[in-house]
């Protein structure tokens, strides 16, 4: 009996919800030693992860924000760079020959626009030794306010959960994050707590306003 696709095909990693300020610092890339080892002992087929400052890892990310700039940075092949800004800062996504649908989508998108981006972290190190992190998009979609608010709340909860585990020495990659990153955890946590509270308060105010009785028309 042949194996089903779910048994024979590797499962996609879940996309991690992460804010721009943490994502931009996630410059360390690694592979798990015991993930799909090759015959020669090297894990060349193993998925690649980026180490998050909060002590987690991300093979794929789900991010949202407002597209503020779209620029064509290469003609052959056509490559577009979009700057996307969330409540913590801006991040970049690059779409090129391996992302033809996303290239077309960005070509027809007019900034500013609120979007969701699902994709893989990608890092580039300059000759000067500076490393920049961006998203290689699998999907870009325009989203409504309700979706943005829901993502913001979920991202805040997931980020705070990772930070709690980090502070309790229970994060899966907490030691590595402490070793490699010089990150202001106190300010970052305060920012995320404030962002989460703002979303809750805003939604509560909108609910209260919607519940107010309407005055009868004359």
Tell me what each language-model feature is:
Residues 1-55, 191-218:
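OB/S1-fold single-stranded nucleic-acid-binding modules
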Residues 56, 66, 72-99:
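OB-fold (S1/OB) nucleic-acid-binding surfaces
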Residues 100-101, 105-114, 120, 126-213, ...:
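Extended, charge-rich, solvent-exposed interface segments
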């Amino acid at each position: 009996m042949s194996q089903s696709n779910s048994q024979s095909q590797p499962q996609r990693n879940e996309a991690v919800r992460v804010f721009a300020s943490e994502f931009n610092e996630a410059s360390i890339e690694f592979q798990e030693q015991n993930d799909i080892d090759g015959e020669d002992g090297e894990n060349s087929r193993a998925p690649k992860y980026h180490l998050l400052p909060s002590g987690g890892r991300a093979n794929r990310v789900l991010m949202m924000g407002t597209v503020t700039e779209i620029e064509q940075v290469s003609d052959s092949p056509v490559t577009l760079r979009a700057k996307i800004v969330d409540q913590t800062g801006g991040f970049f996504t690059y779409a090129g020959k391996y992302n033809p649908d996303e290239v077309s989508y960005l070509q027809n998108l007019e900034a500013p626009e609120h979007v969701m981006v699902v994709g893989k972290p990608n890092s580039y190190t300059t000759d000067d030794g500076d490393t920049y992190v961006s998203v290689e998009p699998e999907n870009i979609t325009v989203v409504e306010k309700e979706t943005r608010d829901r993502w913001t709340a979920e991202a805040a909860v997931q980020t705070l959960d990772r930070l709690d585990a980090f502070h309790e020495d229970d994060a899966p990659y907490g030691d590595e994050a402490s070793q490699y990153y010089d990150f202001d955890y106190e300010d970052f946590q305060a920012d995320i707590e404030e962002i989460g509270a703002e979303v809750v308060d805003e939604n509560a105010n909108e609910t209260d306003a919607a519940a107010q009785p309407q005055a009868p028309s004359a």
